[in-house]
């Protein structure tokens, strides 16, 4: 009789331990994700909009986006703050200053009252510059695009950051190319 009780206690303890392990593993799967859309592909995860992070149902009083499988007001990646896809690729002439406009969607009201920045990645370097939000467009301040390679063009991306710490990013980015006209005078940016 005591052996049956002991056996059941061991089984219950083991099950409770394993359940906690499964929950901890699921939590770790969420916390390592930095994209809203990717977060919502994991059934145990939710996206905290204000905190701009993926968690396992730990958003508190934050706006929460749930996976599409959950019946909720904000459910699925269509509610993720993101750069609008399908914008035409930008092409810049190396050495020229240009302003960039990025169309975004799913802007939550409180976001509009925070500072905005654009993060430009080109030539293996990251540059963060001031930006302004007007309606659903982010206007990045003028930036001198340079192709520092020996290639006719280099590619880069620009993404959108918001909040006072500038660590909260919209999903997605806008691609661009920077042409060296001395190596490729047929580049669209060189014929302007």
Regions found by a protein language model. Give the residues of each.
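Beta-rich interaction modules in large eukaryotic scaffold/regulatory proteins
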Residues: 79-107, 117-191
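A positional/structural detector of protein chain ends, strongest at the extreme C-terminus
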Residues: 1-4, 191-192
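Extracellular Cys-Trp
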Residues: 32-61, 189-192
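N-terminal signal peptide
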Residues: 2, 12-32
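Solvent-exposed loop/turn segments flanking beta-strands in beta-repeat/beta-sandwich domains
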Residues: 111-115
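Proline/serine/threonine-rich low-complexity linkers at boundaries of modular beta-sandwich domains
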Residues: 66-85
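Transmembrane alpha-helices of multi-pass eukaryotic membrane proteins
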Residues: 7-8
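Short amphipathic alpha-helical molecular recognition features
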Residues: 27-31, 37, 92, 110
């Amino acid at each position: 009789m005591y052996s049956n009780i002991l056996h059941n206690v061991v089984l219950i303890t083991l099950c409770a331990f394993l359940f906690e392990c499964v929950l901890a593993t699921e939590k770790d799967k969420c916390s390592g994700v930095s994209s809203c859309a990717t977060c919502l592909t994991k059934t145990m995860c939710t996206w905290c909009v204000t905190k701009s992070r993926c968690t396992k149902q730990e958003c508190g009083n934050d706006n929460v986006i749930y996976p599409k499988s959950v019946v909720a007001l904000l459910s699925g990646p269509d509610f993720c703050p993101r750069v609008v896809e399908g914008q035409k690729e930008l092409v810049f002439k190396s050495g020229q200053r240009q302003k960039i406009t990025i169309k975004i969607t799913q802007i939550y009201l409180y976001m509009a009252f925070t500072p905005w920045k654009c993060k430009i990645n080109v030539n293996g370097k990251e540059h963060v510059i001031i930006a302004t939000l007007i309606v659903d467009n982010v206007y990045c301040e003028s930036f001198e695009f340079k192709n520092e390679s020996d290639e006719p063009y280099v590619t880069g991306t620009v993404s959108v950051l918001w909040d006072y710490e500038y660590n909260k990013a919209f999903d997605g980015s806008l691609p661009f190319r920077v042409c060296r006209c001395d190596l490729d005078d047929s580049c669209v940016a060189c014929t302007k």
